[in-house]
Amino acid sequence: MAKDQKIEKANNFSGTLKRIIKLMFTQYKVSSILIVFFALASTVFGIVGPKIMGQATTELFEGLVAKISNEGSINFEKIARILLTVLGLYILSSLFMFIQGWLMSNISQKMTYDIRKDISKKINTLPVGYFEQRTVGETLSRVTNDVDTLGQSLNQSFTQMISNTAMVLGVLVMMFTISPVMTLIALALIPISGILLGAITKWSQKYFKSQQDMLSDVNGQVEESFSGQNIIAAFNYKEKSVKEFNDKNNQLYTSSWKANFFSGLMFPVINFVGNLGYVGIVFSGGLLVSKGTIGVGDIQAFIQYIRNFTQPIGQIAQSMSEIQKMAAAGERVFEFLDAKDEENAEVLETVTNKEGNVVFDKVKFGYVEDQIIIKNFTSDVKKGEMVAIVGPTGAGKTTMIKLLMRFYDINGGNIYIDGKDISKLDRSELRSYFTMVLQDTWLFKGTIMENLRYGRLDATDEEVIEAAKAAHIHHFIKTLPGGYNMELNEDASNISQGQKQLLTIARAILADKPILILDEATSSVDTRTEVLIQKAMNKLMEGRTTFVIAHRLSTIRNADKILVLKDGDIIEQGNHDELLEQKGFYSELYQSQFAE
């Protein structure tokens, strides 16, 4: 939406509302039923009050007339009984309103809590492709802003809609019992209000949807600016970054003020229509009293009912504003929860002895089905072999690893691990084969010990320390304040890039998996650290199948097999010396890197 500025309504407004209500009455059935009961009971007691209060007014008026004409006096005892009855009704109404408000707040918070749990589970079941097609900010916006909006709007709108709808219907009944003529005048307000509300709702709904989408874009922009701050500064990109943010922020501002402006029109419009109704009621009521058709107390009660009639219509209008926000946010949340999970085969095979033999058999793949980028990939990798995958950018090196780990499913051919077709293996079991060391080191906020133990959660402290020693990082850790208990910050910026790389290698050593993936593992560290890493890697790779993706060909001279990719196909295979002798594409790449 940020790209083409198209503003549109929620795709399935009524469907989203039905799903939210169904969720309420399915997962929180008892509380939801009690909410409806207490909301209706509170409304009924509030509706009866004015009619009974009118009796007190009539009694007082008739008593005054009788006293003036010396025919009687005011019956204060009867008036007191009436007022005590009304007081009791209003106390019960307020008590029931408090109970339903407490229950509704509890349900909305539980729903928010449960949806966040569902989203957390969902994140771990979605394919990698889902996240590669969306920004981090967009996903975060659904987890935070959209879920919060859903919960808050539900809390503010659901009981109001029940109470106000019941109030309107109940008040109509009470008004008919007083005067059908004045009631018909009041009813004339409904179609006028409905037409105006319909027009306002139509305009405001599309802007509420736009507001939620633009908020997602702004979050994405902020996240990118924060995570890429060093790059932005290095390339003197600050002004353009600020401009891009301001553009998105302005779009959010425009959508937000339009949404709130149109929704804000609802109450004053309804209030204006209600005031017109008062004029008609006072005029017709005066005529009816003069004819003796109704009493003075009836007019007092009817005017109170008119207020109780127009006020809930205005509150319904305000509730519609919240419901529109709830629907827009709910649609985005449900869209995330309904996203297709990674699929497993119906009949799963198991592997009892994990060795690490890998076979690519005529593999074909394209991110878009009609745009195949890997056309005919075939290779046989034996247990313990080191296989380097090289080629220019876009040749399909990283894609091959994603296919091996089933982050994506292939379009043709087969991939086998230890004789088992990976499409027949459970994804979690398949991925238990692998450990990875990437150039983009990922360390979470926590202690160094916790980060290393992420490789194997049941590892003892001694095993973690041994892995650190094997990765030549133990001595450095001991020099840090707190040693293994030192806390890394959110992006581990309180240690160097080389140290982060060594920690990820130690984590991989601790994981002790049969297949190792190295993606540019030594391309962002200094020479001394690279030597330490290479020593640790040589030990780690012993007896393990290793796939190395690197542009620096000097790091893969000792590979058992080098696969040279170009345009998705393996055009050359062999070890370093054999490929140089062929004087083909690999030789050209190698010579170009070492040309003076």
PLM-predicted stretches and their roles:
Residues 22, 26-29, 128-129, 147-154, ...:
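An intracellular "coupling" helix at the cytosolic face of ABC transporter transmembrane type-1 domains
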Residues 49, 53, 100, 104, ...:
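Hydrophobic/aromatic residues in alpha-helical transmembrane segments
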